[in-house]
Amino acid sequence: MVLSLLVVEKNKMTNCEEISLDSRPPSYEEIKDKNGITQIILRNLRGDTVRISLYGGQVLSWKNEQGDELLFMSSKATFKPPNAVRGGIPICFPQFGSRGLLEQHGFARNRMWVIDDQPPSPRTNKSKGYATVNLLLKPSDEDLKVWPNKFEIRVRVTLSEDGNLVLRSRVKNANGKPLSFNIAFRTYFAISDISEVRVEGLETLDYLDCLQDRQRFTEQGDALTFESEVDRIYLSSSDVVALFDHGSKRTFQIRKQGLPDVAVWNPWEKKAKALTDLGDDEYKKMLCVDGSAIEKPITLKPGEEWNGQLEFTVLSSC
Ligand SMILES: *[C@@H]1O[C@H](CO)[C@@H](O)[C@H](O)[C@H]1NC(C)=O
């Protein structure tokens, strides 16, 4: 139902919104941030941009052609080890949450990733107007001491010609034994105000409430709205979820494959105050809606590979 609604909106949008076509070809640029960490800036033909840091393999920014930021980034975020960056799209791997020996949400989000050039592939496509980068993380010797599992995680970040942000991920078991993991693409959407948004596509699903020891509940039939702290894992959702923002007249559509669950998080006032890397009022400007595989870990045989994909589209209502 959500899907058909959005298709209509998208068609409507192309008729009523003027898209300023800029003749610069799509581009790929590498820069260093103030800590000397490499960032990649992708730009498509239309002028949308995505900025990615090799620290965490993390998308930090996604802007439309008008320069509006679509992802939330905390004003107090730190961009260097050992902290994870509060905003954008941190990758929670190989676990979600803080169970077991591993650090909260695993270690992928605070390790240095590399650009994966094997096999070499073009970074931009002039005829199709998109730009892309392949990122790779393998465990260090230190990581293997804490979590003795050899793996390769690859994420291909693409900014499509029509401005969609696409994350294609692959995890390969490089062990001689089975590999089990959780994964979540924690996505901090930038919103006008938490009281102005609703999420559709999670109605009537079962969820685990992380504020109540992961007890299982069932969601009501209405779209989700927010008036207090939320930290939930919705189980086995359909492949399309939408975040409507009435304040900015913007809709984010999340399409996912291989990622059955959807984690939804907003820390609200009290927890925001307790988080040193989030401004006291900034919880109003963010909502995390994450494509994830949490309830049932993904298990791979030796040499086996898992694939997942997330595609974010932003639609304006006019
Ligand atoms: C551009 O993208 C199209 C569609 O994905 C592909 O068929 C073509 O080979 C690409 N061109 C280059 C130069 O990579």
Where do the language-model regions lie?
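Short acidic/polar mixed-charge low-complexity motifs
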Residues: 46-49, 58, 67-69, 149-151, ...
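Asparagine-centered strand-capping/turn motif at beta-strand->loop junctions
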Residues: 169-175, 314
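Hydrophobic residues positioned within well-ordered beta-strands of beta-sheet architectures
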Residues: 40, 50, 133-135, 153-155, ...
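Beta-strand-rich recognition/accessory modules
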Residues: 2-45, 55, 65, 138-144, ...
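N-terminal onset of structured domains
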Residues: 30, 35, 45-51, 157-162, ...
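Acidic-aromatic substrate-binding/catalytic surfaces of carbohydrate-active enzymes
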Residues: 39-40, 45-105
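Extended, loop-rich substrate-binding clefts of extracytoplasmic carbohydrate-active enzymes
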Residues: 32-34, 102-161
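Active-site/ligand-binding surface loops and adjacent short beta/alpha elements
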Residues: 178-180, 184-263
